[in-house]
Amino acid sequence: MTRLLDAGATIIGKSTCEYFCFSGGSHTSAPAPVHNPWRMGYSAGGSSSGSAALVAAGEVDLAIGGDQGGSIRMPASYCGIVGMKPTHGLVPYTGVMPIELMIDHTGPMTASVSDNALMLEVLAGPDGLDPRQHAGRESQPYATLMKQGAAGLKIGIVKEGFGWPQSLAASDDKVRKAAQVLAGLGARLEEISVPMHLVGPAIWLPIAAEGATQQMMKDNGHGFNWKGLYVTSMVDFHAGWKARADELSETLKLTMVLGEYFIQHYRGHFYAKSQNLARQLRAAYDSVLAD
């Protein structure tokens, strides 16, 4: 917020999100379901449902969302706006309720790509308070770089990202057609293989379920030995859930039951293994991106 205000933005309010951000739909928020602005009664996606709906409806120019497993990208897709999940640590997460340090991302949601680039330029860069920013990536002139267009860009099409049993063939087709549009603008397409991409969801699950159960819920978002800024008001406010656990959403209850089962029966083994495998997966992506 501070960076946006310093850049001249006006803050008009807070958007509704899904209950504790644990839903990919738009039906679990505390006040009421968030309707898709293009058609009442249809999902706006989640968990940053309100942010996407407000931008799509033209109520705001810019909004901020959080993304641990699609929560910026899915509502952006459902509502027809541009949602950016930045590289981990590029945008400081300071002041946002943590879910799990390893997978916490926050980023811009806008009506256009140019607005998204400009907003990212304002938001990005170290703040000295967020331990996710250990690499210290600086902001870049994204809005200026965007004007160079797609000509000369080399785009890798990960073949393991297509043909999943649970994915829609129409969605796969849309992605490939979008790539061809970029090729028509001068980008170079290359099909690449990242075999470990196939186990990404299995790596993510213990980190999300066990990590969120422990860090977000039991430790009120921070816990002990936190290297970043403690937002004490957030810690105090969040702790109230323990006296009202019956009011938690069904999606969050399910996640906590799963996370607690793993913790009780496997003592963090699969969480630790997933963290180690995540490093290997990141290295696999970095390897192909280096080309």
Model feature map: region roles:
Residues M1-Q68, A151, V158, K177-Q180, ...:
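Gly/Ser-rich catalytic/binding loops embedded in alpha/beta enzyme cores
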Residues L5-D6, V55-A56, R73, M217, ...:
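Alpha-helix boundary recognition
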Residues F20-S23, I72-R73, L198-P201:
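Short secondary-structure boundary/hinge segments and terminal tails
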Residues G24-G25, P31-P33, A52-V158, Q166-S167, ...:
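Fold-level recognition of mixed alpha/beta catalytic cores in primary-metabolism enzymes, strongest
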Residues S43, H105, I263:
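Generic anion/oxyanion-binding catalytic loop in active/binding sites
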Residues V122-D291:
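Amidase signature
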